[in-house]
């Protein structure tokens, strides 16, 4: 039997599906005790496919390297992985793993691929509604992993990763962790570009299912394009993976230091203070820039160097 919903009915059902995101969100202050590192895809889901490699293998290798670096530098911090081998983990289970361990930060590691083999660069995402068509394309590709899951239409309340209208829900989500997510995204993007000298595709927003349920600051990083032969070689090289892992670990160190030193509140101290902070940020950006995360006003001081949208970027 096929059940059809009107737009209102669809949004009501999908809101019930997304409700845990709102219910579980709460401000976390102080010490970083646990980080969850998510290696994208795995098992029967290869992710993006290059000429000689799979996304799932690159993501796992870099994720394990990042975790090892963090654990070596901070033995007291619990490092949790959503997977440590080539196995398939459902998207909704990844967030649950992070939540069950009460992680303070979630980093999902991926690589990209498009038809145009000249497209290159690194981009880091936070949860939200896409502004650019290219951002939607990336989210659709990553969310398509649910099609490897049994009964995914029921499990995700009718969410279809290939339908743009399914992503309307992300415009309604007011993520209490958006400010801190932007902060770690900026640090990761900056360190990756500095370390690899790759093209800076900036910080972006899109509706990733893997990020929707995590009750903590969360980002998804696309380390490069496996469809670009030069970048595929770099992504698979030991030196390339070490550079990327080192960069992410350095970004984590800076984030940890800032959070523990300031113990800042994730949401604004007051509506006016948050609004003033966002107004100042928006005033410093040109009309074409990507920062449109007005869903939540953040009083966190953060560098927005990489919040520049490449409006002419195309994945086609």
Regions found by a protein language model. Name each.
Residues 21-25:
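Sec/Tat signal peptide C-region and signal peptidase I cleavage site
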Residues 9-18:
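Bacterial N-terminal signal peptides
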Residues 250-292, 298-300:
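Pro/Ala/Gly-rich low-complexity, hydrophilic intrinsically disordered segments
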Residues 36, 112, 166-263:
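Active-site-adjacent mobile loop/cap segments within catalytic or ligand-binding domains
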Residues 305-312:
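Conserved small/polar residues in nucleotide/adenosyl-binding loops
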Residues 1-10:
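Bacterial N-terminal signal peptides that target proteins for export
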Residues 26-159, 174-178, 182-186, 233, ...:
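Catalytic-core regions of hydrolytic enzymes
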Residues 156-165, 220:
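Flexible hinge/switch segments at interdomain interfaces of large molecular machines
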């Amino acid at each position: 039997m096929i059940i059809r919903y009107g737009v209102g009915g669809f949004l009501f059902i999908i809101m019930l599906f997304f409700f845990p995101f709102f219910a579980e969100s709460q401000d976390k202050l102080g010490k970083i005790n646990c980080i969850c590192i998510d290696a994208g895809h795995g098992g029967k889901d290869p992710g993006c496919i290059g000429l000689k490699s799979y996304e799932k293998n690159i993501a796992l290798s870099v994720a394990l390297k990042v975790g090892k670096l963090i654990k070596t530098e901070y033995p007291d911090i619990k490092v949790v992985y959503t997977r440590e081998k080539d196995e398939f983990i459902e998207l909704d289970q990844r967030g649950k793993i992070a939540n069950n361990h009460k992680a303070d930060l979630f980093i999902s590691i991926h690589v990209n691929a498009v038809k145009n083999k000249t497209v290159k660069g690194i981009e880091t995402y936070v949860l939200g509604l896409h502004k650019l068509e290219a951002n939607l394309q990336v989210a659709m590709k990553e969310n398509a992993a649910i099609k490897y899951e049994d009964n995914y239409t029921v499990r995700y309340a009718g969410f279809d990763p290939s339908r743009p209208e399914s992503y309307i829900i992300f415009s309604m989500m007011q993520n209490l962790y958006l400010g801190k997510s932007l902060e770690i995204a900026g640090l990761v993007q900056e360190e990756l570009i500095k370390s690899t000298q790759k093209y800076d595709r900036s910080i972006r927003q899109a509706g990733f299912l893997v990020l929707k349920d995590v009750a903590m600051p969360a980002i998804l990083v696309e380390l490069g394009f496996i469809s670009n032969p030069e970048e595929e070689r770099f992504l698979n090289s030991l030196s390339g993976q070490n550079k990327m892992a080192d960069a992410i670990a350095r970004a984590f160190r800076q984030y940890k230091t800032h959070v523990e030193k300031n113990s800042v509140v994730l949401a604004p101290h007051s509506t006016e203070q948050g609004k003033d902070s966002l107004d100042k940020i928006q005033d410093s950006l040109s009309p074409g820039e990507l920062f449109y995360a007005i869903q939540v006003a953040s009083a966190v001081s953060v560098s927005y160097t990489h919040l520049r949208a490449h409006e002419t970027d195309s994945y086609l």
